Amino acid sequence: MVNTNQFIPGLEGVIASETKISFLDTVNSEIVIKGYDLLALSKTKGYLDIVHLLLEGTIPNEAEKQHLEETLKQEYDVPDEIIQVLSLLPKTAHPMDALRTGVSVLASFDTELLNREHSTNLKRAYQLLGKIPNIVANSYHILHSEEPVQPLQDLSYSANFLYMITGKKPTELEEKIFDRSLVLYSEHELPNSTFTARVIASTLSDLYGALTGAVASLKGHLHGGANEAVMEMLQDAQTVEGFKHLLHDKLSKKEKIMGFGHRVYMKKMDPRAAMMKEALKELSAVNGDDLLLQMCEAGEQIMREEKGLFPNLDYYAAPVYWKLGIPIPLYTPIFFSSRTVGLCAHVMEQHENNRIFRPRVLYTGARNLRVED
């Protein structure tokens, strides 16, 4: 029997999964992952530390971290067939569509596709973590009729990722900030894309299928696509006054403004956004160009005063990525690439303690219709 009193649109506040992976503690402004505060970790630990923590359960020592990096480097290359498939896509395709295709095609190269054992899924997770940055970067190059960029083994994981996107080796500061962004995007409890992945995994579908669904979810502007929309607004506005006018115009038309508000954080600033704001300040100080920072701060003030809304991570990640020389269409694919580790952890957990998701509906359509003789 369906209990209509339990209907909550959008499942807001509904507990849909039990997990040991992460939890958003909004009271203490902590993102708890495996018992640690992700925000605190991001100040001293890098993305590979988070990868090891989420997949192995511990923060790695130096030997473990080096072994992890070598493992991922061995997985950088993607099959030639995937490059060929990507080259067949229309040049108008969005990189998220190319990424969705690439992840899906990867499944066909897995000779143990039906195996759901933890050790096999863990191996798949490392393969995906190694290959997805390659697919992200080179799908963009291919769609723009550019030659694929080969990974460099002498660079760190994050530095190589950024290099494959921009074609130039990042500075120490650029590498640090890009790596920190990957950390902040790595895991965030049960957003739409993670829920999608767990729902798919609950059918005992494979890891690739679950992640392919997550790509589709993350593409939406109400989820991952917001960072691209933010940068496009900043580009359109060009100046501080222009951005103020743009925001006031959107507010008067009751249009949704991307980069502000969060279903969980509600009436406070996303703590990850504050860290990306500091990163934007650091990058702006390098050449003395703080226009984007001024624009963002002006927008932040307007939205706080007029709507009581605060920036989320996407709001400040967008200008940071622009400063790093990253093309706008790659902002969301990078989001997905960094979230791959969290998604893999959730799919593995779902496989190991599974109950298929099968909710009901509150039907509001017609009843008792008859076909006349």
From Swiss-Prot:
GO CC terms of this entry: cytosol
Keyword list, A-Z: Allosteric enzyme, Transferase, Tricarboxylic acid cycle
Active site: H262, D314
One BP annotation, GO: tricarboxylic acid cycle
Superkingdom per UniProt: Bacteria
EC number: 2.3.3.16
Annotated catalysed reactions: oxaloacetate + acetyl-CoA + H2O = citrate + CoA + H(+)
Annotated Pfam families: Citrate_synt
Family annotation (InterPro entries): Citrate_synth-like_lrg_a-sub, Citrate_synth-like_sm_a-sub, Citrate_synthase, Citrate_synthase_AS, Citrate_synthase_bac-typ, Citrate_synthase_sf
Enzyme class: transferase
UniProt pathway annotation: Carbohydrate metabolism; tricarboxylic acid cycle; isocitrate from oxaloacetate: step 1/2
Database matches in PANTHER family: CITRATE SYNTHASE, CITRATE_2-METHYLCITRATE SYNTHASE
Quaternary state and interactors: Homohexamer.
Family note: Belongs to the citrate synthase family.
Additional observations: Citrate synthase is found in nearly all cells capable of oxidative metabolism.
NCBIfam families (UniProt xref): PRK12349.1
The protein's name in its UniProt record: Citrate synthase
Native source organism of the sequence: Heyndrickxia coagulans (Weizmannia coagulans)
